[in-house]
């Protein structure tokens, strides 16, 4: 029996042109990336810039991220904005643990990413990544609303293309 490779190749080309093949995870990640449910966790001045991002000038709603949740059980994205103290760290971790999977974390501002100007203080945690798996870091003191929007779009790309960018654990 002779196998016709030319015919198999033609069939393969027709399938690629006319049938959309994807994995369920890829489809879910696409929709997850376009509909974050952020949990606001403003601990200092960065929270004011986070609120400004929701205002008319920056309009975070155009990306579909405007519905900030007050409950961790309804959120899939935690934006840690501000100084985290040793006393506050277990509470932040507990709130993170209450969020449903999949969940992501953005560390917004110098204090949340590395402790900021207070890093040498006796009670300041040197960054949220010491006890949380941070996905995106937004530098600045405080970072501008444009930086928050850029961080959200960066997280969106990480979710859509996880193998190309990777996820920190």
Swiss-Prot record:
Topology versus the membrane: Peripheral membrane protein
Domain of life: Bacteria
Keywords, comma-separated and alphabetical: 4Fe-4S, Cell membrane, Iron, Iron-sulfur, Membrane, Metal-binding, NAD, Quinone, Translocase, Transport
Reactions catalysed, as given in the entry: a quinone + NADH + 5 H(+)(in) = a quinol + NAD(+) + 4 H(+)(out)
Entry cofactors: [4Fe-4S] cluster
PANTHER family per record: NADH DEHYDROGENASE, NADH DEHYDROGENASE [UBIQUINONE] IRON-SULFUR PROTEIN 7, MITOCHONDRIAL
Family note: Belongs to the complex I 20 kDa subunit family.
HAMAP family in alphabetical order: NDH1_NuoB
Protein known as: NADH-quinone oxidoreductase subunit B
Species of the source: Clostridium beijerinckii (strain ATCC 51743 / NCIMB 8052)
């Amino acid at each position: 029996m002779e196998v016709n490779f030319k015919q198999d190749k033609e069939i393969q080309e027709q399938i690629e042109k006319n049938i959309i093949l994807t994995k369920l995870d890829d489809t879910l990640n696409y929709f997850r990336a376009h509909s974050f449910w952020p949990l606001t966790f403003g601990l200092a001045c960065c929270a004011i810039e986070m609120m400004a991002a929701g205002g008319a000038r920056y309009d975070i709603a155009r990306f579909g991220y405007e519905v900030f949740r007050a409950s961790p059980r309804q959120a899939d994205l935690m934006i840690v904005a501000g100084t985290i103290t040793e006393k506050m760290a277990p509470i932040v971790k507990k709130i993170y643990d209450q969020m449903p999977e999949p969940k992501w974390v953005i560390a917004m501002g110098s204090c949340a990413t590395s402790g900021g100007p207070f890093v040498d203080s006796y009670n300041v945690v040197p960054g949220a990544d010491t006890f949380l798996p941070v996905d995106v870091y937004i530098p600045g003191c405080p970072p501008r609303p444009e930086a928050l929007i850029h961080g959200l779009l960066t997280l969106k790309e990480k979710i859509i293309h996880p193998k190309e960018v990777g996820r920190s654990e």
